[in-house]
């Protein structure tokens, strides 16, 4: 090989080595900006949940969600309020910045709370198409990111969890103009497991928020559609409303 060819090869290799960390850093900066724009002291929403299974059989529930804090350092309560057979069923989630969340589920018909074991986080949440793990709120610091492709109006980002997860990695589509996530594809060792699409965005107190979320369980050919008819940010909440005692009494 000539000295010129060798020099070109070395420059090409050096360029590739230098470009790789910048590419990865760009992806992290994008996700940090996504998180920054979504941050709020608290969140409240009410809406409907439709589970559409095989044969297009539809089961509809209504629920309320409250969250105090954000992105890892947060507490949340999710509670069904209709129909009567599921009214009062609730889930308390204590999120952490450096580990998986703690979760307890309350079922009025049995009159006691159930701690959701870590090994059970991959199971479906109360007949829906998302798992208990999907309900966690994790900080971007718990993931590694790489920019997979630039698709014009959106970035496609490959996300890999640093902590134990049912998912090996996921793809996220982030709109460039609003830094909102519009689609997520979740993969396990067996392949694509779930997709999540966010639609009908509206800006509320400066935060772009999807009013419709659709989760598809690819392995079950089932989907769950969430529609939010009431959404509020930075509303007054108390730590006392995010305890097991509060979960029991329906606070």
Region locations from a protein language model:
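Sec/Tat signal peptide C-region and signal peptidase I cleavage site
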Residues: 20-24
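Gly/Pro-enriched, hydrophobic low-complexity segments
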Residues: 92, 102-106, 112-116, 123-125, ...
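Short, solvent-exposed mixed-charge patches
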Residues: 250-251
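Bacterial N-terminal signal peptides that target proteins for export
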Residues: 1-11
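Extended interaction-bearing regions that mediate binding to partners or small molecules
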Residues: 35-36, 82, 140, 194-197
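Short, ordered beta-strand-loop transition motifs
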Residues: 68-74, 147-154, 204-205
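N-terminal mature ectodomain segment of secretory-pathway/periplasmic proteins
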Residues: 26-109
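A short, amphipathic edge element
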Residues: 28, 57-60, 134-147, 192-195
